[in-house]
Swiss-Prot record:
Zn(2+) binds at residues 74, 93, 95, 167. CDD domains: Aldolase_II. This is L-ribulose-5-phosphate 4-epimerase UlaF. Catalyzes the isomerization of L-ribulose 5-phosphate to D-xylulose 5-phosphate. Is involved in the anaerobic L-ascorbate utilization. It comes from Escherichia fergusonii (strain ATCC 35469 / DSM 13698 / CCUG 18766 / IAM 14443 / JCM 21226 / LMG 7866 / NBRC 102419 / NCTC 12128 / CDC 0568-73).
Length: 228
């Protein structure tokens, strides 16, 4: 697991580097599906003092199998998403400013331009709010459940992120680094949408044919963006 712990450590260290976290407000995980184990950031440990060996390994029930610290308080959310969506290899949660602002407003991040469409096939959805019972019960598990309720059976890698109402963004990808990449993009397009709607409050969504072109040329069966 050392290689995966190193990857998760590096991905977590990317969060402050890209300006996605303040203090300890974020976490990254990755899964080894063959072993049924997840590596995740320890809870409340400052980034500047964190080391690769501080990463915590848990099984799919959340039991710690390796590590001296408690895992992230959001571990149950990560595990619920891994259980539901086999294509996920890494998950990120942050409180990045602009994506969190959309979450607090209770609004999806609208697809307004090609930057958004290069990564997200449509709006980045916002979940419903959790009930008092859901919050007082298994809060983190229920956060995962409300994300799944919102995504349904859609391919999560076509919409690699979501904002949880009154909470903040979660993003995911093929692995931990891909998940962080998508979290960075989500924050940028959230900022762009806020600025664009401020300039033109009547601004419409990106034309569907343009969105389809930009998403499919990067992610479709005949994708041609980048190098083989």
């Amino acid at each position: 697991m050392q290689k995966l712990k190193q990857q998760v450590f590096e991905a977590n260290m990317d969060l402050p580097r890209y300006g996605l976290v303040t203090f300890t407000w974020g976490n990254v995980s990755a899964i080894d599906r063959e072993r049924g184990l997840v590596v995740i950031k320890p809870s409340g440990i400052a980034y500047e003092s964190m080391k690769a060996n501080d990463m915590v390994v848990v099984d799919m029930s959340g039991k710690v199998v390796e590590g001296e610290y408690r895992p992230s308080s959001d571990t149950a959310t990560h595990l619920e998403l891994y259980r539901r969506y086999p294509s996920l290899g890494g998950i990120v949660h942050t409180h990045s400013t602009h994506a969190t602002a959309w979450a607090q407003a209770g609004l999806a991040i609208p697809a307004l331009g090609t930057t958004h469409a290069d990564y997200f096939f449509g709006d980045i959805p916002c979940t419903r709010g959790l009930s008092e019972e859901e919050v007082q019960g298994e809060y983190e598990l229920n956060t995962g459940k409300v994300i799944i309720e919102t995504l349904g059976d859609a391919e999560p890698l076509h919409t690699p992120g979501i904002v949880v109402y009154q909470h903040g963004p979660f993003a995911w990808g093929k692995d931990a680094h891909d998940a962080v990449h998508n979290a960075v993009v989500m924050e940028e397009v959230a900022k762009m949408a806020w600025i664009a709607r401020g300039i033109n409050p009547q601004l419409n969504h990106i034309d569907s044919y343009l969105m389809n072109k930009h998403f499919m040329r990067k992610h479709g069966p005949n994708a041609y963006y980048g190098q083989k």
